[in-house]
Amino acid sequence: MNTEKIKNKLKPIIYPIINFIPRRRLKNKNFTIICDNCWAGKVYQELGLPYQTPFVGMFVFSPDYIKMLKNLKHYLSGNIPLKFVQESKYIKDFDNAYPLAILDDIELHFLHYADEEEATQKWNRRLKRMHWDNLYFKFNDNDACTYELMKEFEELPYKSKVIFSSK
């Protein structure tokens, strides 16, 4: 058996043991992570919590992400339908390997979704789970990020935010 197969078989046994203490100590279980990629989903998985954000299995290019954060209630109100498209303003020769949607004027890349129906259902369901009174924001320096965009993120009026950067 190769190493990867062994790791995959041990994960369901080892992870609950490793995560037991952090999960037990966690008091704040009703929070929403707004992020620019799949990171939020991994956090909820590690903590053994249901997804409380629509930002799972997807990513948003940095310019659109910052634009969205500047008017968050508008974009995440649930009143704007997803419009699926075939072309990206960021990816030349987009191959449509995953669903790509426009939310008003923001591109949402549903990277880990099989089709438009799945993306729409999960997006709408998770929008309803958001905890507007307990938001955390995460940004990183991928996907067309610039130093100026990182500065804009830092200047946003949200208190609980973090940037992961290698720049």
Spell out what each predicted region is.
Residues 151-158:
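Short, surface-exposed basic-aromatic patches at helix termini and helix-loop junctions that form
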Residues 20-141, 145-146, 159-160:
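Positively charged, amphipathic N-terminal segments that serve as targeting/anchoring signals
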Residues 1-29:
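Membrane-proximal basic amphipathic "stem/tether" segments
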Residues 160-167:
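A generic structural motif
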